[in-house]
Amino acid sequence: NTIFISAQQHTEHTLEFLWMDSFRSDLVNQTELWQKTICEKTGLAFNEFHMRDLLNIDHPCTFDTVEEYDLLIFRKLISPDDQIHENESSPESHDTLFGLATTPMSFILTPNVLVSVREQGNKPIENYIQRLDTIMGRQIEEQNKPRKLPNTPVDLCLRLLNSMIDGYLDLRTPLTRRVEYWQQQLLQGNRRFKQWHQLFHENMAFQQIENLCEEQIETLEKEIK
């Protein structure tokens, strides 16, 4: 079988799965219309509790499953490469942890549907979509050479998550430098260490970042299982 992607439905080919990508602004500003559109395209209707989760910009990472679908909420680190701008007229603001801002990206999965909800300007996701657009410009027979196209909603979801996890990996270098700095300060024997308040503050930051990463790992492990 030839696997390919298309923005339009091809009646002469079997639809393996459908991906619907949405901006949070569409969901927040036109909630009922968004739900209606999703239902018309996918047949999915989300329960009210999950709708609240999707609308909550501060919702922690989580994984939940119901009979009709699975829900995964991942918190992406906002990097300088992103173009995620907060609306000054909106009361919403992204969660900030010691200077590290995060934003939720939600995934609703079934065996043949993936619905994603993200902020406009999420650079890793936009880069991935650009790659798919480039692939769509090829002939159908050439799109999956070599075999790089996702063939299930879970496969696509994991690829999108992988593109965002790099933001957490990029924290390793600056955090390592800070740890080395404080080690040097503490081990200097020629003068008395007096920066306990700053050290305590940075230790709190390290603990919060560790907790955030552990939450993400636990959530992803549930999703993979």
Named regions from a protein language model:
Residues N1-R147, T219-K225:
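Helix-boundary and N-terminal cytosolic regulatory elements
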Residues R24, D170, T176-R177, Q183:
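Generic hydrophobic/packing signal
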Residues Q30-T31, F46, G167, R191, ...:
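Residue-level preference for nonpolar/small residues embedded in alpha-helices
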Residues N112, Y181-K225:
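Membrane-associated alpha-helical segments
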Residues Q139-M164:
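Long, non-coiled-coil amphipathic alpha-helical linker/lever segments
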Residues P153, C157, Y168-L171, Q188-Q198:
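Residue-level recognition of alpha-helical structural elements
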Residues L158-T176, F200-N203, Q207-E210, E214:
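Short amphipathic alpha-helical segments with heptad-repeat character
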